[in-house]
Amino acid sequence: MTPIQNAQQIFNRQHKNLPEITVYAPGRVNIIGEHTDYNDGFVMPCAINFGTAISGAIRDDHIWNVYAADLDETDEFSLNVEIPKSEHKWANYVRGVVKFIQERYPHFQQGANLVISGNVPLSSGLSSSAALEVAVGKFCQQLGDLPLSHTDIALNGQKAENQFVGANCGNMDQLISALGQENHLLMIDCRSLETTPTPVPQDVAVIIVNSNVPHDLVTGEYNTRRQQCEEAAKFFGVKALRDVSVEQFQKREAELTALSPLAAKRARHVVTENQRVLDAVEALKNNDLTCLGKLMEASHDSMRDDFEITVPQIDYLVELVQLVIGKSGGARMTGGGFGGCIVALAPHDKVDAVRKIIADNYEKTTGLKETFYVCTASQGVRVI
């Protein structure tokens, strides 16, 4: 059963009524451009065919009653008083989104009953949190008939995660969940918010493999990386590392390394990664999978050696995939790091061989069982 069917059926069962509003927002996978979004840089994700659905109906008071079907937990809060934090982590994503929509539209105090159901794996780096934030934002927009664009909904979700949940994420995850296009990757300029759709080549599969090494960005080292990038930007006298070219970085690399070796390594990743995203757009335009594969490999090496966010299990998965696909595609870690998933672009006729080499070796070597997905690039948030 899909999340949409699940949310609708459970709502019907709980409230003896059909839902008035159903919305759906997808998770995402980032093909290239990691930890560049909060440096005002470039990213190239696609929305995937896993996501979060919300079914709901209006109430005649100011209360939101929210049931998370997959966790079997309920949260309840009022919209006509200051919204406090919940002890349930998932509930804070919902509360944060509503709180910041109320900041924009103080008259928005409409109560509702909601059922949430999703199939984005939690803590996998596929943006279950952004899918939830964008779905809640779209639900609010429909419920209150609010003049919110999909970009507004995305940025509101990011604000909720930064200021209410406490994860200092960039804006990529929410933007792609809101703006994704079917069968396209979306190059996003995280400063101007300009998007450039790039078709996924027809003969290419988007493969995601979850290492099942869990990660938690709020308590992890994500925020430290962000501080190190800000330190490097200050050294270059710019607003963000987006404003430093590869040539400019190389000229002053030794000077920065002497001052702060770690900030220099982090900056080298971000500056070169931004260039790799721009090069990847060209490679895809030219249907040059060999070039794209090299860029993805360089991106992974940079995350491993300079940004230091991969773990041995992830490195091993990438090695296994590269053995099979060779020069006909690419593989790299995707997401915040410290666990999560790898992404590969490979010809459809290599998918079974990739699945087999991982099934034969990964669990035997690491003691962890992988989860294997073949995804399609999907449309962003929508009303059902």
Curated annotation (Swiss-Prot):
Pfam families: GalKase_gal_bdg, GHMP_kinases_C, GHMP_kinases_N
Record: residues binding Mg(2+): S129, E161
Site residues by UniProt (Transition state stabilizer): R28
Domain of life from the UniProt record: Bacteria
Single GO term (MF): magnesium ion binding
Residues annotated as binding substrate: E34, H35, T36, D37, Y222
Catalysed transformations (reactions): alpha-D-galactose + ATP = alpha-D-galactose 1-phosphate + ADP + H(+)
PROSITE patterns in alphabetical order: GALACTOKINASE, GHMP_KINASES_ATP
Record: residues binding ATP: S123, S124, G125, L126, S127, S128, S129
UniProt-annotated location(s): Cytoplasm
Top-rank EC class of the record's enzyme: transferase
Annotated pathway: Carbohydrate metabolism; galactose metabolism
InterPro entries reported for this sequence: Galactokinase, Galactokinase_bac, Galactokinase_CS, GalKase_N, GHMP_kinase_C_dom, GHMP_kinase_C_sf, GHMP_kinase_N_dom, GHMP_knse_ATP-bd_CS
Active site (UniProt): D173
GO biological process, one term: galactose metabolic process
Coiled coil region boundaries: none
Any one annotated GO CC term: cytosol
SUPFAM superfamilies xref list: GHMP Kinase, C-terminal domain, Ribosomal protein S5 domain 2-like
Keywords per UniProt: ATP-binding, Carbohydrate metabolism, Cytoplasm, Galactose metabolism, Kinase, Magnesium, Metal-binding, Nucleotide-binding, Transferase
EC numbers, comma separated: 2.7.1.6
Primary role: Catalyzes the transfer of the gamma-phosphate of ATP to D-galactose to form alpha-D-galactose-1-phosphate (Gal-1-P).
Recorded family membership: Belongs to the GHMP kinase family. GalK subfamily.
UniProt protein name: Galactokinase
Gene name as annotated: galK
